[in-house]
Every structure is written in C-alpha cells, then in structure tokens.
C-alpha cells in the first residue's frame, strides 16, 4: 500500500474503494447520485437483469411486470442506457459484475445449499446460457471480473464435485475468451474447502466477503485471508455476527459493528499485499446508503 513521493519518501497510497450498486435497490440514476455524494466512481453491477428475461431490476421490488416493459416503457433498456452513458462520460467504471441465479433460495442455510449457484442440474442449461451472456456484457462494460457463487462444494460427493468443476471450467474458459476473470464469492464453504477446489482450477479466483463466512458459520474471516491469499482478487466490505443457533443464518450488521473485526481484517489484507478494490456491500438495514457512506469514510481513514 505504498507509493513514492517526489521527495523519495514512501507514502501510503489511498485505498481503492468502490460500492455494490445492487445494495442501493435503486435506479442507476439514483445510484449515481449517491456515489457522487461520497466521491466514489467505481461500482459493481448485477448483470442478470440485462441478460435474463425473467430477472428483475434491483429497484422494482420484485415486480416483474416492470421489467417486461408493460405499457410501452422498457425500464431495462433505460437502465442499461443510463449505465452506458455513465461509463461513456467517465463518471463510472465497473469494478465487477455479478451473476446470480434466480433460482437461489436464501430462506434457510439448507435451501441455499440445495438451490445455490451452478450445482442444480435442473437449472444448469439455463444458467449456462445466461452466464455466457453475462460474461459478454462484463467485457462490453470493460469490467475485469465477473462474480458468482459456485454453489455448495461437497468434497465427499466425488461425482457431484467433478460435475461442478466441469461447469466452473466451462465458465472460466468463456471468461478467458472474453478477457474477463472469474471470481467465486466466499460463502457456504470453509476457506480450506474453497482452497482445495481452487487448487484444481487454475484461472479461477476469489471475491472475498468476510461477512459471508460469518453468516454461513464457516470460520474466521481473518484466518481465511491467509488461506485464500493466492486467489483473492476482489473484496466485499461487509460485516455480520455469528448465529447463536447452529444451522441458522447469522445476521448482517453495519461495517465495524459485527464479528469480522475490521481492524484485524484490513491488517490481514495489508499483510498479504492486497491492493485491489474494496467494494462496500450492504444487504440489510433501513439506511443502506447511509451505512455504505459510513463504511466508505471508515476505509478512507485507514491509510
């Protein structure tokens, strides 16, 4: 995190801070306004609303009729036009895109284990087509990464694991052809299990979300930084507290208010020499924009 000044004295470079656009649950225009308030120009964007005809925009509250353009209006086209206008005029850069299957069921830990990511056979062909289009969009937006949850990694199911690895290799190869890197988000696997998978998948990397490890009850995120260090390319800044009941979700909190241990986590990133984007994400709470602004301010203080 250091750069040389004109006097030759080393000075720490400012941290690279971005935001997850989907956290705002708002239109691109409103997201742009919030980003301007906090002086951030790099955003992570969900790709699926623009490539999956059955997806919903983050600001529609799940009202699919708005996505289909009922009444002669096409909000998807308008959102994409606004995004691409912000990219063209230099107001925005896309740090990462997100592919998330619309079949993911986060009701319980068990439901997401069954339905999440690229694992379910019944949705693979559809997901394969959608993720291919999402990769093309990622390249068009000049984003270096596309992020997804692989799904439940079960090392005891050799046939199932081999199938998942084949699917990830397919997606990785599509990414390579497009000049994009595939990053898997930490979630329902331990750091050791994810590292074992990645060791067999050259060219696949990690989006490290420390809160997810806590929400799923999958270990200490600070230790996990060291385990996954060779693969970490992108970071979500998010906090959470562990569940007191095994088998149930933990709870998300404001950044620095949970069990991640912000000081130790940032120190761990510095220790491994991470200098990529720290993307603030908030998926709970009544004032997401305010919470994200406070997280951005906190990160900027940590020079």
Task: Report the location of each language-model feature.
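Histidine-acidic metal/acid-base catalytic patches
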Residues: 2-18, 24-41, 88-91, 169-177, ...
């Amino acid at each position: 995190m250091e750069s040389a000044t004109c006097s030759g004295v080393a000075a720490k470079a400012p941290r690279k801070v971005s935001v997850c656009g989907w956290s705002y649950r708002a239109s691109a225009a409103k997201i742009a306004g919030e980003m301007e308030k906090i002086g951030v120009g790099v955003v992570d964007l969900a790709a699926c609303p623009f490539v999956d005809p059955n997806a919903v925009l983050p600001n529609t509250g799940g009202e699919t009729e708005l996505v289909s353009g009922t009444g002669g209006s096409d909000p998807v086209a308008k959102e994409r036009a606004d995004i691409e206008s912000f990219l063209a005029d230099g107001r925005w850069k896309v740090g990462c895109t997100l592919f998330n299957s619309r079949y993911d069921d986060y009701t319980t830990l068990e439901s997401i284990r069954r339905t999440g990511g690229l694992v379910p056979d019944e949705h693979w062909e559809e997901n394969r087509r959608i993720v291919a289009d999402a990769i093309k969009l990622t390249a068009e937006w000049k984003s270096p990464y596309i992020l997804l949850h692989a799904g439940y990694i079960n090392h005891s199911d050799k046939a199932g694991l081999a199938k998942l690895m084949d699917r990830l290799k397919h997606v990785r190869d599509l990414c390579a052809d497009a000049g994009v890197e595939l990053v898997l988000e930490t979630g329902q696997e331990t750091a050791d299990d994810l590292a074992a998978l990645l060791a067999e998948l050259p060219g696949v990397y990690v989006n490290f979300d420390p809160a997810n490890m806590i929400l799923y009850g999958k270990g200490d995120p600070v230790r996990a930084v060291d385990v996954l260090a060779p693969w970490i390319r992108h970071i979500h800044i998010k906090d959470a507290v562990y569940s007191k009941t095994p088998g149930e979700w933990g709870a998300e909190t404001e950044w620095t208010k949970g069990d991640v241990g912000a000081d130790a986590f940032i120190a761990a990133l510095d220790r491994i020499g991470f200098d990529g984007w720290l993307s603030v994400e908030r998926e709970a709470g009544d004032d997401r924009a305010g919470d994200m602004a406070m997280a951005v301010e906190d990160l900027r203080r940590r020079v």
